[in-house]
Amino acid sequence: VPIQKVQDDTKTLIKTVITRINDISHTQSVSSKQKVTGLDFIPGLHPILTLSKMDQTLAVYQQILTSMPSRNVIQISNDLENLRDLLHVLAFSKSCHLPWASGLETLDRLGGVLEASGYSTEVVALSRLQRSLQDMLWQLDLSPGC
């Protein structure tokens, strides 16, 4: 498979996930930069410049989304899995060794936050995920390093 096709597929999937997030209407109600106490473990406030950082970020979001009780996020979580696979193919094409990122070390914190404020966590996570995906889309055009 030509690597340009993989890169195009990656961008298309990113755009699809962004559209899915937009379709969940309540995600529009919070800024991705808004500071919400207890949710600082959710990435999305810093630029994502490398393929390994993209994979790590997606691993964290995937872990967060699969822990949420909401059914809205199941397809998005599946899409993130596929997106991570595509990033690994891109990394391999650049001779990058991309270890399979595992996400958050401490799920205890996540469980407590979800119990206390599941709705807020979902809104903030999806909003920041959307911002992170937009960053990734932009970075892919710049041919990111390992």
From Swiss-Prot:
Keyword line: Disulfide bond, Obesity, Secreted
Top-level taxon of the source organism: Eukaryota
MF terms (GO), sorted A to Z: hormone activity; peptide hormone receptor binding
InterPro entries: 4_helix_cytokine-like_core, Leptin
Disulfide bond positions: C96-C146
Key word Disulfide bond present: yes
Subcellular localization, as worded in the UniProt entry: Secreted
Entries under Gene3D superfamilies matching the protein: 1.20.1250.10
Pfam families referenced in this protein's UniProt entry, alphabetically: Leptin (PF02024)
GO cellular component, one term: extracellular space
GO BP: activation of protein kinase C activity; bone growth; cellular response to leptin stimulus; energy reserve metabolic process; intestinal absorption; leptin-mediated signaling pathway; lipid metabolic process; negative regulation of appetite by leptin-mediated signaling pathway
Keyword Secreted: yes
Function: Key player in the regulation of energy balance and body weight control. Once released into the circulation, has central and peripheral effects by binding LEPR, found in many tissues, which results in the activation of several major signaling pathways. In the hypothalamus, acts as an appetite-regulating factor that induces a decrease in food intake and an increase in energy consumption by inducing anorexinogenic factors and suppressing orexigenic neuropeptides, also regulates bone mass and secretion of hypothalamo-pituitary-adrenal hormones.
Membership in a protein family: Belongs to the leptin family.
Protein name: Leptin
Organism this protein belongs to: Pongo pygmaeus
Taxonomy of the source species: Eukaryota, Metazoa, Chordata, Craniata, Vertebrata
Gene: LEP
